[in-house]
Amino acid sequence: MRHRNSGVKLGRTSSHRKAMFQNLANSLFEHELIKTTLPKAKELRRVAEPLITLAKNDTVANRRLAFARTRNAATVGKLFTVLGPRYKERNGGYLRVLKAGFRAGDAAPMAYVELVDREVNTSAE
């Protein structure tokens, strides 16, 4: 019985899953918009949102904890200098998951994951 076991396995070992979500979170924080499969996007919220909440309080201990979870110094820097202050007044809900149709090769449902209130470059103007 898997009572109270939250999270989706996504057909991967625990170490592969951990590395994959670490990489997805790093890409999301770097680019602020990524495209992935819908189940990965939904599960990514459970990894990325607590990191942004952690970044709202800039302490050495929080920076070390964020580095332990992301293993990327550039990501930690952006979290605490850009994203933490940006979401200081927002209580959660930092990510938006938008459905993006189906992948051509295997018809997997795709989704865009973006940070709410990100600066959008409009090239149409």
Swiss-Prot record:
Keywords: Ribonucleoprotein, Ribosomal protein. InterPro entries: Ribosomal_bL17, Ribosomal_bL17_CS, Ribosomal_bL17_sf. GO terms for cellular component: cytosolic large ribosomal subunit. One of its GO terms (molecular function) is structural constituent of ribosome. Transmembrane segments: none annotated. It comes from the Bacteria. PROSITE patterns: RIBOSOMAL_L17 (PS01167). GO terms for biological process: translation. Belongs to the bacterial ribosomal protein bL17 family. Part of the 50S ribosomal subunit. Contacts protein L32. This is Large ribosomal subunit protein bL17. It comes from Acinetobacter baumannii (strain ATCC 17978 / DSM 105126 / CIP 53.77 / LMG 1025 / NCDC KC755 / 5377).
